[in-house]
């Protein structure tokens, strides 16, 4: 009897010991493989990073987007190529940039699967497409829409929205003493621009809001803060999807805001599909006017399988998200440095005197604004130091190995480089952390052009590059034209605009209370 009572306990203990032993044996073998047998074992870097992705997760989750700066220290210690996690390499050598980020005619380039898994719910959009050929198929119809010619068709709309923001809204704050958050204002402006691309004549609900729709700004910033968690632990996404929306809304009120955002995208899509159904056959003449992005896609050569409601809605979410936050951040950074540097502001206004003389009766085009050389230097320097995207842009060569100096990188290995390193290379940009537009006015070296990559390069270069340039040109020229609205900073310093956290997109200090000004 006594022996029978002990038997289950002994069996349970043995089972527990067996499970623990098996787990320990597996982990030991995994460590040995990653340190000594992996195809990446030959590459330099800290052993802990080679063993576990938790090393990266610690810096990005606990320290909120600081792994980029830890990688910089790795490069300082180990050299131009380092292993930054068990699966991925980082290169800091701008001469190699055009070898990694190539056109599709040179070789196919895949997206890193872990990145796609980590951006939550955008699989199926062009930006979250892993495989090269499928990405090319999905992006091809979008390229003409966002080309220089395509963006030129949007300029009347850009001019109208810019006038509404700066003349109607900003100038109404003169001598009121009201504290205005320009980060909210620019995020609302960029959001309304993309909304106009998605739907004919939508209400400009973001810019028209008395406080510039802080919910819109908060939705993106709160969502961005979760990215390190999902990129480090992508399986969590599948768990979250199992939770009913009603419960998620109670756990995280921000979910309701995101659902509002998704519903807005779905509304845009429904309008476009109704138009398509009423239209019947293709009407290529719509490109002569300003088509919405959905109308453009629905009249493209994409097969029906690529035009489902789910895929088109995700494409809209990506376009609205990526077209909003980075442009707004760059505008904040540029405006701050113009305001705190009176000499820069004075020279910029001199540069704009003739081209903006008859504004708003005559609104200059983007092409005309490009003739204002100092304006272009200010914008270029602003994009250099706001980086576009700080996060390493990881690429995979699926079929052929890559050669970097004496290292052969096996096919299929993810490799990333960052604009943060290229834009701050002191051998190319002396005094790299200083805002010096003059560096772009004369003696611009080939190395400066090579290292300037705010929108990346190659087959996966930023789709919205031309639109971003056009928006920034219109806003900066209109805001700082002679006779434009005058404002002063309110309890704002460089930490409120300077990128300090790499959360896929660069964010300033998370302690910031915003880019605040008072119009005089």
Swiss-Prot record:
One Gene Ontology MF term: iron ion binding
Keyword line: Heme, Iron, Membrane, Metal-binding, Monooxygenase, Oxidoreductase, Transmembrane, Transmembrane helix
Gene3D superfamilies, per the entry: Cytochrome P450
Residues holding heme: 462
Membrane association type: Multi-pass membrane protein
Reported cofactor(s): heme
Enzymatic class: oxidoreductase
Localization per record: Membrane
Chief site of localization: membrane
GO biological process: terpenoid biosynthetic process
EC id: 1.-.-.-
GO cellular-component term (any): membrane
Protein family: Belongs to the cytochrome P450 family.
Function: Cytochrome P450 monooxygenase; part of the gene cluster that mediates the biosynthesis of the sesterterpenes ophiobolins, fungal phytotoxins with potential anti-cancer activities. The first step of the pathway is performed by the sesterterpene synthase oblA that possesses both prenyl transferase and terpene cyclase activity, converting isopentenyl diphosphate and dimethylallyl diphosphate into geranylfarnesyl diphosphate (GFPP) and further converting GFPP into ophiobolin F, respectively. Other sesterterpenoids (C(25) terpenoids) are found as minor products of oblA.
Protein name as it appears in the record: Cytochrome P450 monooxygenase oblB
Source organism: Aspergillus clavatus (strain ATCC 1007 / CBS 513.65 / DSM 816 / NCTC 3887 / NRRL 1 / QM 1276 / 107)
């Amino acid at each position: 009897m006594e022996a029978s009572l002990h038997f289950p306990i002994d069996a349970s203990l043995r089972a527990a010991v067996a499970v623990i032993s098996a787990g320990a044996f597996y982990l030991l073998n995994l460590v040995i493989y990653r340190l000594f047998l992996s195809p990446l074992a030959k590459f330099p870097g800290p052993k802990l990073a080679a063993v576990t992705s938790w090393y990266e997760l610690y810096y990005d989750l606990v320290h909120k987007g600081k792994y980029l700066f830890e990688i910089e220290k790795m490069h300082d210690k180990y050299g131009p190529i380092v292993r930054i996690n068990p699966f991925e390499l980082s290169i800091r050598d701008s001469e190699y940039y055009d070898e990694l980020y190539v056109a599709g005619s040179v070789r196919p380039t895949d997206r890193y699967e872990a990145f796609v898994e980590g951006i939550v719910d955008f699989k199926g959009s062009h930006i979250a497409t892993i495989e090269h050929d499928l990405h090319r198929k999905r992006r091809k119809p979008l390229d003409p829409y966002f080309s220089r010619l395509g963006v030129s068709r949007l300029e009347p709309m850009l001019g109208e929205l810019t006038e509404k923001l700066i003349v109607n809204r900003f100038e109404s704050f003169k001598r009121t003493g009201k504290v205005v958050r320009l980060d909210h204002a620019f995020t609302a402006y960029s959001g309304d621009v993309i909304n106009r691309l998605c739907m004919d004549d939508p209400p400009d609900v973001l810019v028209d809001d008395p406080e510039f729709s802080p919910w819109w700004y908060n939705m993106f910033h709160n969502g961005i803060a979760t990215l390190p968690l999902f990129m480090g632990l992508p399986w969590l996404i599948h768990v979250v999807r199992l939770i009913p929306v009603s419960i998620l809304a109670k756990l995280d009120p921000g979910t309701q805001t995101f659902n509002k955002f998704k519903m807005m995208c779905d509304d845009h899509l429904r309008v476009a599909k109704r138009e398509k159904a009423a239209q019947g056959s293709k009407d290529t003449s719509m490109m002569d006017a300003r088509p919405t992005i959905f109308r453009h896609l629905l009249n493209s050569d994409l097969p029906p399988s690529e035009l489902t409601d789910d895929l088109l809605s995700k494409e809209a979410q990506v376009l609205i998200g990526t077209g909003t936050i980075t442009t707004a951040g760059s505008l904040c950074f540029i405006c701050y440095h113009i305001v705190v540097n009176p000499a820069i502001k004075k020279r910029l206004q001199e540069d704009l005197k003739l081209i903006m003389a008859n504004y708003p009766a005559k609104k200059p085009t983007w092409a005309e604004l490009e003739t204002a050389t100092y304006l272009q230097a200010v914008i270029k320097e602003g994009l250099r130091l706001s980086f576009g995207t700080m996060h390493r842009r990881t690429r995979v060569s699926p079929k052929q190995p890559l050669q970097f100096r004496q290292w052969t990188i096996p096919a299929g290995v993810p490799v990333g480089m960052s604009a943060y390193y290229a834009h701050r290379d002191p051998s190319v940009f002396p005094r790299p952390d200083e805002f010096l537009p003059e560096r772009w006015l004369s003696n611009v070296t080939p190395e400066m052009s090579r290292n300037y990559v705010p929108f990346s390069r190659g087959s996966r270069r930023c789709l919205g590059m031309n639109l971003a340039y056009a928006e920034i040109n219109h806003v900066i020229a209109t805001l700082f034209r002679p006779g434009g609205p005058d404002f002063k900073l309110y309890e704002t310093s460089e930490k409120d605009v300077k990128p300090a956290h790499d959360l896929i997109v660069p964010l300033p200090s998370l302690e910031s209370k915003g880019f605040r000004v008072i119009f005089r």
